[in-house]
């Protein structure tokens, strides 16, 4: 879902609806991770999606700024029920988007996406906000980017010694990983437009 003029209200509704769908399909409290890119609206959307998820009882792990493939990998690696990536990929910076991954690291099936959309469009389906111990908890990961970088490096069987590489991170989420990955492979890196 790509959103122009993203709002806290809409992203909170997405979080609530996603938590409701997960709760209906699981026998335990849902665990959802959230990663984001570096767009100006990403932190705002992260907070409102997390609030929506927690308000319907899901526990949330905030990954911080990570590339989209990191969420797809880490949701499976950490054993989470779903992963959310806040990013509009190649779209202009005033846009933002929300991608939801299932526990396998693949996108949610269309039927679950349609169910989430149906709940958002029919607010009567959304359960009341939980209170007390039923409210989900939010924690932050200090190791998400490191865990993803270790995984990427474990899949690459190439060395880059004697290479000088220029990387334009375009002020995006690869800013947290590109230099570390290429330098670990032996490259001499020149990085521009890194956050």
Regions found by a protein language model. Name each.
Residues 19, 26-104:
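Ferredoxin-reductase
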């Amino acid at each position: 879902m790509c959103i122009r003029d993203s709002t806290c209200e809409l992203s909170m509704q997405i979080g609530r609806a996603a938590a409701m769908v997960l709760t209906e399909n699981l026998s335990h409290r849902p665990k959802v991770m959230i990663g984001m890119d570096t767009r100006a609206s990403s932190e705002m959307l992260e907070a409102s999606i997390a609030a929506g998820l927690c308000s319907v009882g899901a526990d949330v792990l905030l990954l911080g700024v990570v590339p989209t493939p990191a969420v797809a990998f880490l949701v499976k690696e950490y054993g989470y029920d779903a992963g959310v990536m806040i990013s509009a990929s190649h779209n202009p910076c005033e846009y933002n988007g929300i991608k939801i991954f299932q526990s396998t690291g693949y996108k949610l099936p269309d039927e679950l996406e349609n169910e989430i959309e149906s709940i958002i469009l029919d607010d009567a389906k959304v359960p009341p906000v939980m209170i007390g111990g039923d409210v989900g908890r939010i924690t932050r990961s200090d190791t998400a980017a490191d865990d993803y970088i270790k995984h990427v490096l474990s899949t690459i069987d190439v060395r880059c010694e004697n290479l000088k590489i220029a990387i334009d991170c375009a002020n995006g989420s690869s800013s947290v990983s590109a230099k570390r990955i290429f330098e670990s492979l032996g490259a001499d890196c020149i990085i521009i437009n890194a956050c």
